[in-house]
C-alpha cells in the first residue's frame, strides 16, 4: 500500500445550530477567511491526491463563498461522521490513506498533520488531546499496555470512561484498503442514533491493525467551533500568534492585544503600528512606515517613510514614499499616490493618480482624475465626476493652485500652473498659466433692513 497516496476528506455538512446564524457554520470567519477555507488551505499544503469536502446544510452558500478546486460531495442526510465519510468513498483511491479533517477546526496546522501521518504509516493515526475540561467529548480508551482500543462518546460512556481526560479530536488517518468495509459495517445503535466515525478505532483493533495516537502540542490546534464564544476565542488566539510573529520580525505593535490581521502583511524595517488597526487582504508596508490608531487598511501598498494618521481608511490603493495621510482620510480603490503627497483630514480619493508633492490637506473629493506634481487643492474642492449616468475624467497639470470651495465639473482639463479663484465652478478647460474665475460678483445693498417678527 503506497504510503504517499493521500486522500483528504473534510467534513463540513453540519447545521451549526448553536451558532444561531443563517450562515453555515463553516463559513464563519477566522482571520477574515471562512473556517473551511482555512482547512482547505492546510489540506492542500500536504499535496494530497485529492481533497473531498462533504457539504450539506447551506451547500449553495458554501459553494458560492468557497470557490476552490476540490471535490464537493453532498451529504443529503446528516447521519453522523461515519456516514459523511462514506458519501466521499466513490472519490477515494483504492489504496493509500485517507486523512479526515473538519471544516470547523480552523487552526489545525501542517506540522501537526505531518507528524500524525508519519506516526500512522500504513495503519491508523489518531490525533488526541488532554484539555482542561473534556466534557462533551469522546474519550480515548486504552488497555493495560497503553494501546488504544476504542473511542467512546460521552453520551455512551460509563462513569469510569467519563473520568478519562484524554479525548478524541476527530482527526484520523485511515488505510483505504480497509475503509469501505469498516464504514459499511458501522451501526447507528447508540445514544445519538448516528454512524460514528470513531467506531472505526475498535474495528481496526479487531482486525489487528495498530492505532497510533499522537497528542496535539496545543489544544487550540484541534479545537472545534460550535458557538460564537468558541469562535472569538480561536480568533483571539490566531491574532495573538500573528502579532507574536510580527514582533519577532521587528515590527513595533503598540499593543499586540489590539491588532487584527485578516490577510498577509509584508513589511520592511522599523514599522510602527498603533492600537486598534485592522489589516485585510494583501498589505505591504515599506521601511519606517507608521500606522496611527484605528486605521483600516485593505489590499494596500505603502511606501517607505510614509505616515498614516489615525482613523484613516485605505483600500486597494498605492501610496508612495514620504506621504502624509490623514487623520480621517479615505483612499478608495485605484487611488495611486506618488512620493511626498499630503492627504489631510476628510479627503477622499478614488481612481485617481496623484503626482509627486501634491497636497490636498482638507475637505476634498478627488475622483476619476489625473493630477500632476506640486499641485495644491484648497479646502472644500470637489471634482464632480458623475453626470448621473457616466463617470468622467478630470486632468490637472503641475503646480496648479485650486482655490477653496471650487467645483471642477468633469470632463475638464486644467493646464500647468493654472490658478482657480475660491468658490469657482469650473466647467471648461483652462490653458497653462491662466487664472480661472467662475462665480457671481458680490453685490452689497445699501439701506437694506433685516425683517423682524412682529412683537405681540
UniProtKB/Swiss-Prot annotation:
Q: Which residues form a coiled coil?
A: none
- The EC code for this enzyme is 2.7.7.23, 2.3.1.157
Q: Which UniProt keywords apply?
A: Acyltransferase, Cell shape, Cell wall biogenesis/degradation, Cytoplasm, Magnesium, Metal-binding, Multifunctional enzyme, Nucleotidyltransferase, Peptidoglycan synthesis, Repeat, Transferase
Q: Which residues form the active site?
A: 362
Q: Where in the cell is it found?
A: Cytoplasm
Pfam family of the protein (one) = NTP_transf_3
Where are the residues of the annotated region Pyrophosphorylase? 1-228
Please give the positions of the paired cysteines in each disulfide bond. Answer: none
Q: Where does Mg(2+) bind?
A: 104, 226
GO-annotated cellular components: cytoplasm; membrane
Main location as per UniProt? cytoplasm
An example molecular function term from Gene Ontology annotations: magnesium ion binding
Q: Which reaction does it catalyse?
A: alpha-D-glucosamine 1-phosphate + acetyl-CoA = N-acetyl-alpha-D-glucosamine 1-phosphate + CoA + H(+); N-acetyl-alpha-D-glucosamine 1-phosphate + UTP + H(+) = UDP-N-acetyl-alpha-D-glucosamine + diphosphate
Q: Alphabetically, which GO biological process terms does the record hold?
A: cell morphogenesis; cell wall organization; lipid A biosynthetic process; peptidoglycan biosynthetic process; regulation of cell shape; UDP-N-acetylglucosamine biosynthetic process
**Amino-acid positions noted as binding acetyl-CoA in the UniProt annotation, renumbered to this chain:** 379, 385-386, 404, 422, 439
Which sites bind UDP-N-acetyl-alpha-D-glucosamine? 11-14, 25, 75, 80-81, 102-104, 138, 153, 168, 226, 332, 350, 365, 376
Q: Give the pathway annotation.
A: Nucleotide-sugar biosynthesis; UDP-N-acetyl-alpha-D-glucosamine biosynthesis; N-acetyl-alpha-D-glucosamine 1-phosphate from alpha-D-glucosamine 6-phosphate (route II): step 2/2; Nucleotide-sugar biosynthesis; UDP-N-acetyl-alpha-D-glucosamine biosynthesis; UDP-N-acetyl-alpha-D-glucosamine from N-acetyl-alpha-D-glucosamine 1-phosphate: step 1/1; Bacterial outer membrane biogenesis; LPS lipid A biosynthesis
Span list, region Linker: 229-249
Q: What's its job?
A: Catalyzes the last two sequential reactions in the de novo biosynthetic pathway for UDP-N-acetylglucosamine (UDP-GlcNAc). The C-terminal domain catalyzes the transfer of acetyl group from acetyl coenzyme A to glucosamine-1-phosphate (GlcN-1-P) to produce N-acetylglucosamine-1-phosphate (GlcNAc-1-P), which is converted into UDP-GlcNAc by the transfer of uridine 5-monophosphate (from uridine 5-triphosphate), a reaction catalyzed by the N-terminal domain.
Q: Could you describe the subunit structure of this protein?
A: Homotrimer.
HAMAP family the record matches: GlmU
Which family does the similarity line name?
In the N-terminal section; belongs to the N-acetylglucosamine-1-phosphate uridyltransferase family. In the C-terminal section; belongs to the transferase hexapeptide repeat family.
Q: What is this protein called?
A: Bifunctional protein GlmU
Q: Species name for this entry?
A: Neisseria meningitidis serogroup B (strain ATCC BAA-335 / MC58)
Source organism phylogeny: Bacteria, Pseudomonadati, Pseudomonadota, Betaproteobacteria, Neisseriales
Amino acid at each position: 500500500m503506497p504510503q504517499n497516496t493521500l486522500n483528504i476528506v473534510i467534513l463540513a455538512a453540519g447545521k451549526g445550530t448553536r451558532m444561531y446564524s443563517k450562515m453555515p457554520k463553516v463559513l464563519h470567519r477566522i482571520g477574515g477567511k471562512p473556517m473551511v477555507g482555512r482547512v482547505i488551505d492546510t489540506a492542500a499544503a500536504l499535496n494530497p491526491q485529492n481533497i473531498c469536502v462533504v457539504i450539506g446544510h447551506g451547500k449553495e452558500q458554501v459553494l458560492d463563498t468557497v470557490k476552490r478546486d476540490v471535490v464537493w460531495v453532498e451529504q443529503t442526510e446528516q447521519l453522523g461522521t461515519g456516514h459523511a465519510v462514506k458519501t466521499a468513498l466513490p472519490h477515494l483511491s483504492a489504496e493509500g490513506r485517507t486523512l479526515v479533517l473538519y471544516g470547523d477546526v480552523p487552526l489545525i496546522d501542517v506540522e501537526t498533520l505531518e507528524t500524525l501521518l508519519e506516526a500512522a504509516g500504513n495503519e491508523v493515526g489518531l490525533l488526541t488531546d488532554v484539555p482542561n475540561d473534556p466534557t462533551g467529548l469522546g474519550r480515548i480508551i486504552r488497555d493495560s499496555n497503553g494501546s488504544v482500543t476504542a473511542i467512546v462518546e460521552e453520551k455512551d460512556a460509563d462513569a469510569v470512561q467519563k473520568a478519562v481526560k484524554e479525548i478524541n479530536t476527530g482527526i484520523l488517518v485511515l488505510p483505504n484498503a480497509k475503509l469501505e468495509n469498516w464504514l459499511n459495517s458501522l451501526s447507528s445503535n447508540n445514544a445519538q442514533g448516528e454512524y460514528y466515525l470513531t467506531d472505526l478505532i475498535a474495528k481496526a483493533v479487531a482486525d489487528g491493525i495498530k492505532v497510533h495516537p499522537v497528542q496535539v502540542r496545543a489544544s487550540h490546534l484541534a479545537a472545534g467551533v460550535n458557538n460564537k464564544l468558541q469562535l472569538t476565542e480561536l480568533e483571539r488566539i490566531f491574532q495573538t500568534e500573528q502579532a507574536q510573529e510580527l514582533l519577532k520580525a521587528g515590527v513595533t505593535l503598540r499593543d499586540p492585544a489590539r491588532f487584527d490581521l485578516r490577510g498577509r502583511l509584508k513589511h520592511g524595517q522599523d514599522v510602527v503600528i498603533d492600537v486598534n488597526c485592522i489589516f485585510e487582504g494583501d498589505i505591504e508596508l515599506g521601511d519606517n512606515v507608521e500606522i496611527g490608531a484605528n486605521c483600516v487598511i485593505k489590499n494596500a501598498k505603502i511606501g517607505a517613510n510614509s505616515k498614516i494618521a489615525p482613523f484613516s481608511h485605505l483600500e486597494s490603493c498605492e501610496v508612495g514614499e514620504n506621504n502624509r495621510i490623514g487623520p480621517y482620510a479615505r483612499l478608495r480603490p485605484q487611488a495611486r499616490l506618488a512620493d511626498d503627497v499630503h492627504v489631510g483630514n476628510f479627503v477622499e480619493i478614488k481612481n485617481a493618480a496623484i503626482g509627486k508633492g501634491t497636497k490636498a490637506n482638507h475637505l476634498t473629493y478627488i475622483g476619476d482624475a489625473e493630477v500632476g506634481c506640486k499641485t495644491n487643492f484648497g479646502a472644500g474642492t470637489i471634482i464632480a465626476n458623475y453626470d448621473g449616468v457616466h463617470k468622467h475624467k478630470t486632468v490637472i497639470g503641475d503646480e496648479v493652485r485650486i482655490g477653496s470651495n471650487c467645483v471642477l465639473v468633469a470632463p475638464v482639463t486644467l493646464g500647468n500652473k493654472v490658478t482657480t479663484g475660491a468658490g469657482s465652478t469650473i466647467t471648461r478647460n483652462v490653458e497653462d498659466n491662466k487664472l480661472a474665475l467662475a462665480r457671481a460678483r458680490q453685490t452689497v445693498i445699501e439701506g437694506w433692513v433685516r425683517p423682524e417678527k412682529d412683537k405681540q
